[in-house]
Amino acid sequence: MKKKNISPSLVLHPLLLLLLPFFAFNSLALKFSPQLLSLLSLKTSLSGPPSAFQDWKVPVNGQNDAVWCSWSGVVCDNVTAQVISLDLSHRNLSGRIPIQIRYLSSLLYLNLSGNSLEGSFPTSIFDLTKLTTLDISRNSFDSSFPPGISKLKFLKVFNAFSNNFEGLLPSDVSRLRFLEELNFGGSYFEGEIPAAYGGLQRLKFIHLAGNVLGGKLPPRLGLLTELQHMEIGYNHFNGNIPSEFALLSNLKYFDVSNCSLSGSLPQELGNLSNLETLFLFQNGFTGEIPESYSNLKSLKLLDFSSNQLSGSIPSGFSTLKNLTWLSLISNNLSGEVPEGIGELPELTTLFLWNNNFTGVLPHKLGSNGKLETMDVSNNSFTGTIPSSLCHGNKLYKLILFSNMFEGELPKSLTRCESLWRFRSQNNRLNGTIPIGFGSLRNLTFVDLSNNRFTDQIPADFATAPVLQYLNLSTNFFHRKLPENIWKAPNLQIFSASFSNLIGEIPNYVGCKSFYRIELQGNSLNGTIPWDIGHCEKLLCLNLSQNHLNGIIPWEISTLPSIADVDLSHNLLTGTIPSDFGSSKTITTFNVSYNQLIGPIPSGSFAHLNPSFFSSNEGLCGDLVGKPCNSDRFNAGNADIDGHHKEERPKKTAGAIVWILAAAIGVGFFVLVAATRCFQKSYGNRVDGGGRNGGDIGPWKLTAFQRLNFTADDVVECLSKTDNILGMGSTGTVYKAEMPNGEIIAVKKLWGKNKENGKIRRRKSGVLAEVDVLGNVRHRNIVRLLGCCTNRDCTMLLYEYMPNGSLDDLLHGGDKTMTAAAEWTALYQIAIGVAQGICYLHHDCDPVIVHRDLKPSNILLDADFEARVADFGVAKLIQTDESMSVVAGSYGYIAPEYAYTLQVDKKSDIYSYGVILLEIITGKRSVEPEFGEGNSIVDWVRSKLKTKEDVEEVLDKSMGRSCSLIREEMKQMLRIALLCTSRSPTDRPPMRDVLLILQEAKPKRKTVGDNVIVVGDVNDVNFEDVCSVDVGHDVKCQRIGV
């Protein structure tokens, strides 16, 4: 069908009708200017916040014919009043560009970047034939890029970065003979790069990275003699780099990383004397690094990582005096590192890990005072560690593991105030570990395991202010543990296994932060200190293969999160305290090869591996196939009951007896009697406690969707599993597999026997609340599938989330993402949480207040999408009238709660702000370094109040050195500070928080296993894109932007 020609007046007619009241008194003055009507059509067609077009108003007095020339974003010609520049960038606009934009016929500059414009790209823009700059980057335009751009014959700059275009790259771009900058990066273009692009003789900048382009690289691109920046990485090309690219004599930046290229590196690239950045990583290049590359005297950044290169580092690299970044990781390179590399005056980053290098490291490495990070792990380096590595006190990451380094650690490292992460395991280092590491205020991670260190473990490790991980296992200390080791303020994981330690285990007083303690395979003796109950966060305790004696402290069973206990291969005696049978968290309890007697506790122990109790001749019970002699053990219990009828004495009772005995001077016989009494009190626990009597009635299942299992299925599954996913203030969560194979999460709310709280439930209130929660449906909310209840217990049935929680991701220490990918994922999680809370606050009737928002209540589904859990559950339980109910968790509770004892939507906003601060800083909501009584909110505000560099607050491991990520983190910091305002009235509603977050959302795209992080055409900084190899530190690679 043939298109009709439509006159401008007819096109504008509907708009005139719409605006008729507006011009009722002003029609003559404004003369219905197409300039005005085109701009007003933009205003009416695009949606955005009120501020977007706040000053785009037409006066009713008719005093200004060209009123639009004073509007924000609009620049007019001084003579004709025609619009020559229109900048609507970063206004949070959405919608589609109206056809009336074509009547801005004098427009030279049009910037629509940083919005959410969508749909096909409007061809009406191609009618703006005078345009010299067109920026549509960071929007959501989709479909194929339409033909017609060649009509913009004066165009110099075209930026379409980060959209959703697909199909082939437009070939008619090649007809833009004045074009200097071309950016089609970050979309989904496919096919080959048009060879005709090689005819753009004035082109200085081309960016096609982050698409799905394929085929061979066009040799004709070598004809772009004015080109300074070529960025075409993260595509799927094949073949080699054309030798014609050596003709790009003005090229400064060249990036073909992650492109599936192969073959040898072209010798001719060594002729690019102006080249400053050369990124060829993650390809299939083979052969040696050409010696001609030593001619690249301007080179600052060189990354050949993750290829199949062989041979050695060219000796001429020692002459690259401007080089700051050298990364050759994961190749087959060998030989020695040229000595001159250590004397490069600007070198800040050296990555050589996972090669076959030999010899010693350059002895002057770091002497330039600028070295910041070095990783030479997984090679065959020998000799000593250079003492000059931290000469400028800027080194923050030093990774040396899996080599053959020998000699002592340089004492200079103990003065390296910048050091954050130090890994030197699996070497041949010897001598004494120098004192001083404990004074390093930034040191968080130290691994010196599997070396030959001797003498004493430095006691000052216990004073290291932020140290979280310390591994000294497999060494030759032959000394006692430092008495103060458990007082380390932030130490979470401590391993000194198989290190020839002797003596007794120090008392556990002060053991507040430890998650894992590994002391197996030593020669420790004495008893296990009873005050291990101080280790409140302990998950894993391994004291196996030592010479420990005495009884097993019942205090271990009271640790709220303890999961793995290994006391095997010792000389322990007595019985296993019955308290362990009621533990809800223990999944492993290995006491094999000891001298234990008596019954194995029932309860949760019934599902443990029988081998955990082997080689204890005196143990009895079903697990070891030996029936217990009830008369023998009952007699023993009766004897104890005669002395302690009212309640079994705990450790403190035994301690009192010891004190009294010493005080009155009664000697040996009284001590024996007290000891016997104390040991018998442990035996009494075999038959005591932990049993719930009485009839609790039948189970009832209330389902909120169709379920393929029954209440009995749930109860039976829980009776057979000890797979605890978590435990909190409201109950314990189990992973349960139903008979049909479906996996769900079951939250058993605390009953009346939880500690001494004597919690009771209001039956009707519970059911009413559950009914409200069961009807919540949102993609960012964990779905409540149903509820099982009886007279004494309530269990909530949720969909199972396989990827753990945000707390695991932030603080679990298992980094499986790159820095850029992790930040992007965390930002998306933050948005997901905001969307979920926004739904609860603004779309539910009645409004649902979460009451306990924290990272452990934010779960991650199979796609790492955030799902808010435990919303409203805190209202389902209450304590006796004499007990006070604390709504929320320490560190996340809004300050006004202290005097109002009320929780509302603003309380959730505060908790959400704390979560954002945890994401930004990498720290927990409460840490010792914040000072007594202070939270992360106080700490951040104190840092900003003292005018410390805001970047010092940002998490180093999250890529804060990357300009784009750094600015995004600062933006999130501003939002977090708003949310954690002391006054509730100053906190924005979650709807506004969500809007701000979405406006500042980072533009990232994933292709395969790679995250594309590419910057704006006008941004000449660099992004760090980090990859993780199993067992390695984060490896940073860079993508120029």
Curated annotation (Swiss-Prot):
Reactions catalysed: L-seryl-[protein] + ATP = O-phospho-L-seryl-[protein] + ADP + H(+); L-threonyl-[protein] + ATP = O-phospho-L-threonyl-[protein] + ADP + H(+)
Modified residues (Phosphotyrosine): 798, 839, 892, 899
The organism's place on the tree of life at top rank: Eukaryota
Gene Ontology CC annotations of this record: plasma membrane
Outcome of substituting residue 186 to A: Reduced interaction with CLE41 peptide leading to desorganized vascular tissues
Record-listed ATP binding positions: 725-733, 747
Active site: 852 (proton acceptor)
Pfam families the record matches: LRR_1, LRR_14, LRR_8, LRRNT_2, Pkinase
Localization, UniProt: Cell membrane
Its membrane topology: Single-pass type I membrane protein
Modified positions (Phosphothreonine) in chain numbering: 710, 900
Name of the molecule in the record: Leucine-rich repeat receptor-like protein kinase TDR
Species per Swiss-Prot/TrEMBL record: Arabidopsis thaliana
Lineage of the species this protein comes from: Eukaryota, Viridiplantae, Streptophyta, Embryophyta, Tracheophyta
This protein's encoding gene: TDR
